Amino acid sequence: MITKEEAQKIAKLARLKFEEDTVEKFFTQLSTIMDMIDILNEIDCKDIEPLTSVCNMNARMREDAVTSSDLSSELFDNVSGNSTQLAKEVKYFITPKVVE
């Protein structure tokens, strides 16, 4: 159980401001929460293994394989117009000017 002064200190540290009529409600709710935490702390959990996953599924892993990631030749095969060759050489898309 916490005191009313402790509840006010917690509210101040959390930068919470309450009207006078809601301070009592905050104190009651915080007291209830702290009582629930005390009940949970009474449970003996020292022989219980931590839960690593909610579901017992094994991740399906794939083998890592090194592959070529230079797809620029395939990418620039789709370039059309009179700047096709230049686009393939510099590996940039050449577009009309959009902003003046």
Curated annotation (Swiss-Prot):
Enzyme class of the recorded protein, top EC level? ligase
Matches recorded under Gene3D superfamilies: Glu-tRNAGln amidotransferase C subunit, N-terminal domain (1.10.20.60)
**Does this entry carry the keyword Nuclease?**
no
Which parts pass through the membrane? none
Q: Which GO terms describe its molecular function?
A: asparaginyl-tRNA synthase (glutamine-hydrolyzing) activity; ATP binding; glutaminyl-tRNA synthase (glutamine-hydrolyzing) activity
Show the SUPFAM superfamilies listed in the entry. Glu-tRNAGln amidotransferase C subunit
- Provide a GO biological process annotation: regulation of translational fidelity
E.C. code:
6.3.5.-
Q: What keywords were assigned to this record?
A: ATP-binding, Ligase, Nucleotide-binding, Protein biosynthesis
* InterPro entries assigned: Asp/Glu-ADT_sf_sub_c, GatC
Q: Which domain of life is it from?
A: Bacteria
Quickly give the catalysed reaction. Answer: L-glutamyl-tRNA(Gln) + L-glutamine + ATP + H2O = L-glutaminyl-tRNA(Gln) + L-glutamate + ADP + phosphate + H(+); L-aspartyl-tRNA(Asn) + L-glutamine + ATP + H2O = L-asparaginyl-tRNA(Asn) + L-glutamate + ADP + phosphate + 2 H(+)
UniProt keyword annotation of Transferase present: no
Family as reported in the entry's similarity comment: Belongs to the GatC family.
Task: Please give the subunit comment from the record.
Answer: Heterotrimer of A, B and C subunits.
Role this protein plays? Allows the formation of correctly charged Asn-tRNA(Asn) or Gln-tRNA(Gln) through the transamidation of misacylated Asp-tRNA(Asn) or Glu-tRNA(Gln) in organisms which lack either or both of asparaginyl-tRNA or glutaminyl-tRNA synthetases. The reaction takes place in the presence of glutamine and ATP through an activated phospho-Asp-tRNA(Asn) or phospho-Glu-tRNA(Gln).
What is the designated name of this protein?
Aspartyl/glutamyl-tRNA(Asn/Gln) amidotransferase subunit C
